[in-house]
Regions:
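Active-site residues of response regulator receiver
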Residues: 8, 54
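Receiver (REC) domain active-site loop signature in two-component systems and cognate sites
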Residues: 57
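Two-component/phosphorelay signaling modules centered on CheY-like receiver
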Residues: 2, 11-31
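Short amphipathic alpha-helix used as the core "switch/output" element in two-component signaling
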Residues: 63-74
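Active-site beta3 strand of CheY-like receiver
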Residues: 46-52
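Receiver (REC) domain switch/output surface
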Residues: 112-132
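Acidic catalytic/metal-coordinating carboxylates
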Residues: 35-38, 61-64
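Alpha4 helix (beta4-alpha4-beta5 surface) of REC/receiver domains from two-component response regulators
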Residues: 64, 83-117
Length: 132
């Protein structure tokens, strides 16, 4: 069973991600945070197998949190953001800062199975992956 921490300021997006993953037998969403500040404690408390992270959030953004996580042996991070479309500067920066992969938030509903497959690859692979 893979434990997932979902970090996104949008309640709707968090609900979509949670539903996609909880429909799978091998995933369990152990925490859901609307900010980096809320997520920090959850990372230590729940020790997730994988983290999904939005980039554009109030307060501390996802890029800064990627930098924080880089110095710790935490779970792989899958960035889920409308800013990380394939080939975008934000996608490149997220990967450079330690994200395992990126997925375009706008594609979650249409390509939910691809998202789940990417999360599954992130927890089982140590190399950088490509997302939608």
């Amino acid at each position: 069973m893979f434990n997932v921490l979902v970090i996104d300021d949008s309640l709707t997006v968090r609900a979509i991600i949670e539903q996609l993953l909880e429909d799978e037998k091998d995933f369990r969403v152990v925490g859901s945070a609307d900010s980096v500040a809320a997520a920090r404690e959850m990372v230590e408390k729940f020790v997730p197998s994988v983290i999904t992270l939005d980039l554009a959030m109030p307060g501390i953004d996802g890029f800064a949190f990627l930098d924080e996580l880089a110095g710790h042996p935490h779970a792989p991070v899958l960035v889920v953001s409308s800013h990380t479309t394939w080939g975008s500067a934000a996608e490149t920066e997220a990967i450079e800062r330690g994200a395992k992969a990126c997925f375009d938030k706008a594609q979650l509903v249409r390509h939910g199975k691809s998202f789940v497959a990417l999360v599954r690859k992130a927890v089982s692979n140590t190399t950088t992956l490509n997302g939608a």
